[in-house]
């Protein structure tokens, strides 16, 4: 934040609290993965922490809602996730979305993002 000029834009993106809490409740292994998510951020506290560093909060939005269910399945079947039918099927569904971008899946993703979005992005302006 020290190199950003006043009026500059800053984006912070973190795992969204609700979907991440579900993952942590379903699997201790998930939360202990090397390089994994180290903590769960609360939206209001993260905004306040960044504002305290000299930024103005502009907006936030959530993304990747259809990924939440995939991670919940992986956490639920952690030990057998590589061979589990549901995890495998849902992974194919996500690959379809990523590679082909069917409009109906985009619609579902956008519809569910406000509640189930796996990631949340925060937009700020430097004072």
What are the language-model segments listed below?
Residues 49-55, 126:
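A structural motif corresponding to the C-terminal end of an alpha-helix
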Residues 36, 41, 117-119:
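A conserved catalytic-core signature of glycosyltransferases
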Residues 15-39, 47-49:
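Short, glycine-/aromatic-enriched active-site segment of Class I SAM-dependent methyltransferases
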Residues 13-14, 63:
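Alpha/beta-hydrolase-fold catalytic nucleophile elbow
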Residues 25, 67-127:
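A C-terminal cap/extension of S-adenosyl-L-methionine-dependent methyltransferases
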Residues 55-65:
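Conserved S-adenosyl-L-methionine
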Residues 19, 65-66:
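Positions that flank functional sites
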Residues 1-9:
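A short glycine-rich, Lys/Arg-flanked "PGG" loop and its adjoining helix->strand segment in the class I
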